Amino acid sequence: MAPTKGSGSGKASNKGDAKKSKPLSSASKVNKKTAKRPPPKEVKSKARTESSLLKKTKKREYTEEELGLPKLNAITPVGVVKPKGKKKGKTFVDDAEGMMTILAMVNAEKEGQIESKMMKARQLEEIREAKRKEAEARQAQKKSKLEDAKQSIRQKRKHKGGSSETKAEAPTKESSSKSKGKKKSVAFA
C-alpha cells in the first residue's frame, strides 16, 4: 500500500506539531499595528492665475557647433560653404562656371558610357548578320546538292528507259499488282 502522511518517523511529527503551535500570521499583524507612520502632509497647489506660471521663459537655443553633433548625410564639395537657411541639395556652388565644368565632365562620362553601349550593340548586330548569312549560305548549298542529286537520278532513268510512255505505264502496272497481292493478317491465339 502507499504510505500516508500520518505514518513516518516520530521526530518528523514532533517538528510538524511545533510549527503548528507558532502562529506566524498573528506576529506579523502585531508588527504592522505597532509601527507608527507620520501623518500625511497636505500639498498646497498654487493658483493657476499666478504671474509666475503665466510667464513664458525663453529657452536657450544651442548651435550645432556648441552641441558638437557629427554631420550626417552631408556631402559637399571641398571649399564650398553652404549658406544656412537654404534647402538641402539645391545650390552647392555659387560659381556658375565651376558648376558648368562639373556638369560637362559628368555628361562626358555618361556619353562615353552610352557610346560604348552603342558600339557593343553594333558589334552584336554585325555578328548576328554574319551568322544569318552563313545559315543562308548553308541552306543554299543543301538545296544545290539536293537539286544535283535529283538531276543525276533523272539522267540515270533516262539512260535506262527508252521513252517516257513506258515510264508512265510502269507505275500503273505496279499499283495494280500491289492491290491484287495477298493481304497480310495477324491472328492471335
Curated annotation (Swiss-Prot):
Keywords: Coiled coil, mRNA transport, Nucleus, Ribosome biogenesis, Transport. InterPro entries: Loc1. GO terms for cellular component: nucleolus; preribosome, large subunit precursor. It comes from the Eukaryota. Residues 39-49, 130-151, 166-177 have a biased composition (Basic and acidic residues). Residues 1-69, 130-189 are annotated as: Disordered. It is found in: Nucleus, Nucleolus. Residues 179-189 have a biased composition (Basic residues). GO terms for molecular function: mRNA binding. One of its GO terms (biological process) is mRNA transport. Residues 106-160 form a coiled coil. Belongs to the LOC1 family. Component of the 66S pre-ribosomal particle. Required for efficient assembly and nuclear export of the 60S ribosomal subunit. This is 60S ribosomal subunit assembly/export protein loc1. It comes from Aspergillus niger (strain ATCC MYA-4892 / CBS 513.88 / FGSC A1513).
